[in-house]
Amino acid sequence: MVHGAADISMREFDPRRFGDYATKDWQVIKAKEDYCLRHEIPFPHFNRLAGRPIKPSPLYDRLKDAGAVFEEVYGHERPRWFARDGVAQQDHYSFCRNEVHVMVGTEVAAVRNNVGTMDITAFTKVEVTGTGSAEALQRLVANRLPRKDGGVILTHLLNRRGRIEIEVTVIRLAGDRYYLVCAAFFEQRLLDHLANHGGDGLTVINRSTGWAALALQGPKSRAVLAEVTDAPLDNAGFRWLSARQIGIAGHDVWALRMSYAGELGWELHGPAENMLAVYDALWAAGEAHGIANYGSFAMNAMRMEKGFKGAGELTNEVTLPEADVMRFVNLETGDFIGRDETIASQQAAEAGTMPWICAYLAIDADGKADGHGGEAVMHDGRVVGSTSSVAYGHSVGKVLAFAYIKPEAAAPGTALEVVVMNEARKSVVLGEAAWDPQNLLPRTDG
């Protein structure tokens, strides 16, 4: 820990899990709330409401009127799900499925079949510029930086032990100007990593509060976007995993053609004061296409269907080979932080001596409870690991999970059991994504 890289994940104790929004008055409010909640049942996704909202996005009121039930992430108000059909606009706590499960399924279906929008303003958004910024960033990331303006990559920042500190999307805006996007609660950790390891030539601008962002996802997203911008949107004019500035409702935004939902889609990033007008324009154009709002619960279900890893899997307790994300690594880029340790871990994997690996599982559904992460995984009557993320895949009708398990139990097709609420459920290791395994949908032309 004294070297900046603890052996275990310290997220729950890291003071950087709070930002400058955590003023003295806010701390007093939350301390009182904590005392009042001392004997409450610790339901999954328990939502602490005191001292909120403190960092509402420009869309907060509009989404609240649309039925949003919010969660707080690093001070930001992010929609979890949207109440409709007489369901109360409040948290509904349970260890099992309830009416929220149905609401989330409706949101997933809207994105998969038509088009949906999500307020993703909570993401950490940082701009990096300066002479030599490319060289400095290349020493920090495990993938090759984009070589052309508008290029987009997914990569990881590692510590000196080769463990994962942060997963980050890097966009080359122009020349030596880069835009970095990662999870909300990594904001200060990303800023610290850049300050500690980036060198003196970097200029870092934190856009996390000044900019807002929207996701527009689904097979009809291109049709909706085409009604509000003159920019080319086909594959020839706007390729998959690329970015460019486009105009919407009289405002310039950065459009990133990428999708955490695994569909044709874009993320739209720009100054916060303009994003409500952008949202309203998209909705006016999208009503004829069945546009719907969706929240983080639906987003999580869809990323699980696609086999995309998240914060539960990518911690500073594991290496890139252990997390099974080596497809996002380029070892030929030079001596990035953690490179030698990554190679050593890869060699351990090849030798069969790696302690664990992140496996993708399908679990039998009982229609009542799906699990929440932390469930024991069994093979031939013995514990071989535990789940890190679990969600019901509404599009595929399966409970899906990521789990860190012994490598000998991780081969695709291996029969396992996962203990959900004290009941052993049949499970199997998957070798490909449950939804669109060839990843064709995000690349759809038109």
Predicted regions and their residues:
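Acidic, proline/glycine-enriched N-terminal capping motif
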Residues: 13-158, 163-165
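A short acidic-Thr-Gly-centered motif at the start of a beta-strand
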Residues: 107, 170-171
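Conserved, structured C-terminal
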Residues: 3-8, 42-72, 78-80, 84-86, ...
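Polyanion-binding and phosphate-handling cores
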Residues: 1, 11-13
